[in-house]
Amino acid sequence: MIADKALPSRLDDLNLAQSAVNPPQAQDIGVDRLVTDRDGTASDISVTVVPVESAEGHIRPYPKQWEQRTALRDGTAIFIRPLRPEDEPLYKPFFSAVTKQDVRLRFFGPVKEFDHAFLARFIQIDYITAMAFIALDEGTGRMLGVVRLHTNPDGVTGEYAILIRSDLKDRGLGWLLMKTMIDYAPTQGIRVIEGQVLRENSTMLTMCKELGFRVEPDPVDFSVCLVELRTDKF
């Protein structure tokens, strides 16, 4: 807390706004009102910091370092980047390019309407506990696919889900998104990536095996396979 709000001290050398979103996390700011120069600038400022992982209420900024430009097998240039809150308009055209069958395989059932309430669940993301990477066509800006990773409460396992446009299968897009997600997971302390895949989704199961996932039948639901990848193998 600031010791005296009325003190006309300048904190030019201390970027308080940035300290709210970037590590280290400012926990306490103290200003000694007795130690100031003639123009009222405080010269004795103390800041107590704690590591990001232990700072409650920490807001993680957009992770720009995870942006990448690459290409599909046919040479189509794509841009893979973390999801942003303003990306909702990209989703409706994207879902219109996904068949009902592929929607069912992704959500384990039909989706009647991709309205704002439905899409909001995907757009509102906390980078501390979840991540979503979207692939965009460099030429048109259209959304081509998305992979998500949610950290489980234990902090060391995470669950993934992926969906790409139905007309882009077998062009390497799913592989690129999965690899991006797999590379990202250990940087967040996730040691095991988990997922549930319908047994009939042979394309996804084949890719999981090629990526090194262990694939086993769900002991509770025979229609589902459980997939698991240990990130410490890489």
Model-derived features: positions:
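Long, contiguous binding/interaction regions
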Residues: 2-3, 10-11, 39-234
